[in-house]
């Protein structure tokens, strides 16, 4: 995947002189063109993957994952005024970095879209203070709130021995949804990117302008040069991380297995 050792071998095989000598030759066979892969499977993959992932998996493209992590994000497309709907579920993506503590407030829409309607960013804070602020904002709809935290919050211990998850439950936020262990960061990123724009061009994630930290995070988080590791030196990734927990939990990118068949 990406510019790996296999890409180096493929590049050697494209050398005309080595081809002339009969020493090396390489080809690209595009899965999407195969007569043995059903068209319906290709179309389903387009809807379930972001453009770069689809190009890599189905178009035999060596995709460079450097640059912006959330590359489909575009203010002109994804940012617009959004109205909180008291009749819909309230999802809170929660990152437990102490400075800042970052929460993203989301509402899944009946048409399949996901709206980020607000955010909460508290500096030099703690989990109890986050709960208090969420209580202040959403006490009327507390029964509709589901917390989607960083899974590490189940294990980080506080003074009385309770975890971050315990604190949420003690404060009355009883619906807490998280996996037992961290999913790979790449899977979480791919889930967000697919919601921003699928390979078929569909956008399902929109963000209200008041979510300034989230917008900044989606625009500016980059990969470390030459790797698929996020550059966290700027400390701006936390809101995007908070967004990623509910998105990956409820809209995960499926690991597709090409079964074949005929068109």
Task: Describe the predicted segments one by one.
Residues 1-48:
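ASCE P-loop NTPase helicase motor core
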Residues 15-16, 107-110:
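Short loop/turn segments immediately following beta-strands, especially the blade-tip
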Residues 34-94, 99, 113:
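ATPase catalytic-site recognition across NTP-hydrolyzing enzymes
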Residues 101-107:
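Short beta-strand scaffold segments in enzyme catalytic cores
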Residues 111-230, 251-263:
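Mg2+-dependent endonuclease catalytic cores in nucleic-acid-processing enzymes, primarily RNase H-like
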């Amino acid at each position: 995947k990406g510019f790996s050792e296999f890409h180096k071998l493929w590049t050697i095989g494209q050398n005309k002189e080595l081809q002339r000598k009969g020493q090396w030759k390489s080809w690209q066979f595009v899965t999407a063109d195969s007569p043995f892969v059903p068209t319906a499977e290709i179309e389903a993959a387009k809807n379930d993957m972001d453009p770069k992932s689809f190009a890599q998996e189905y178009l035999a493209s060596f995709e460079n994952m450097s640059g912006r992590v959330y590359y489909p994000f575009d203010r002109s497309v994804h940012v617009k005024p959004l109205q909180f709907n008291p009749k819909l579920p309230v999802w809170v993506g929660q990152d437990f970095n102490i400075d800042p503590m970052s929460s993203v407030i989301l509402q899944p829409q009946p048409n399949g879209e996901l709206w980020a309607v607000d955010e909460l960013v508290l500096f030099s804070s703690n989990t109890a203070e986050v709960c208090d602020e969420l209580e202040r904002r959403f006490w009327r709809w507390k029964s509709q709130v589901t917390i989607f935290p960083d899974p590490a919050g189940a294990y980080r211990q506080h003074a009385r021995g309770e975890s971050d998850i315990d604190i949420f439950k003690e404060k009355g936020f009883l619906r807490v949804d998280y996996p037992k262990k961290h999913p790979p960061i790449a899977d979480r990123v791919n889930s967000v990117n697919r919601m921003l724009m699928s390979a078929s061009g569909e956008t399902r994630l929109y963000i209200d302008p008041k979510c300034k930290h989230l917008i900044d995070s989606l625009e500016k988080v980059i990969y470390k040069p030459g790797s698929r590791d996020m550059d966290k030196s700027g400390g701006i990734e936390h809101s995007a991380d908070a967004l990623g927990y509910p998105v990956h939990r409820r809209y995960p990118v499926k690991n597709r297995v090409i079964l074949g068949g005929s068109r």
